[in-house]
Amino acid sequence: MPTLLKNNTSPFARIAHAALIDAAVPDLTVQIADQWNDDPALLAVNSAGRVPCLVLADGTAIAECLLIARYADSMSAKPSPGNDAPQILSVAGLALGVCDAAVQTLVGRKIVSGNFADIAFDASPIGRKRRRTMVDGLAELDARINATPGERLDLATIAAVTALDYVALRFPDADWIPDTPRLTALRAATAERPAFRDTWPFL
């Protein structure tokens, strides 16, 4: 049976997990890994020490969320239509950029002060760039996302909703998060899909 190594907050792990659930990959198990402290179980299958990592029954390990999502779709009895379409890939890439900027903001805070809540890093040139990426990226996602979900969730939908949820999780009181009415409506419309309901991030 395949085992997904993840943590409870990583947006990249959530994208992979959501894709596996939506594709109905059978017999999936989940193992929580600590990527911040060189978890031996994680390092044994992924020398980069990053989540997500999917370990197949034969021991083959697949790292990185987009590659896991691609594998999940290949294993589905009903592959998600359009996942290789340029528009889907473009929107998914934009969402990944938002996720990466959010994660790198937290990493920067950790490096500067050792505290995720300390916002001193955010005022640095790199911190401001990360903030701009999140703000502009969410606004563009709101403009470009297909707000009508299909029977299967495409990669753009999974990545965009994950990006919105992750920014809200990590920056709950931020006044710089733009209004995203279309993306927020899509999140509400898909909230009870197992792919999102069963992967909800928490601190």
Residue spans for each PLM region:
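Non-transmembrane alpha-helical segments in soluble domains
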Residues: 69, 73, 89-92, 138, ...
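C-terminal end-helix/capping segment
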Residues: 178-199
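Short coil/turn segments at secondary-structure boundaries
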Residues: 107, 200-203
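GST-like fold's C-terminal all-alpha helical module
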Residues: 95-185
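Surface-exposed helix-capping loop/turn segments at secondary-structure junctions
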Residues: 78, 143-152, 194-200
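GST-like domain detector, emphasizing the conserved glutathione-binding G-site
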Residues: 1-121
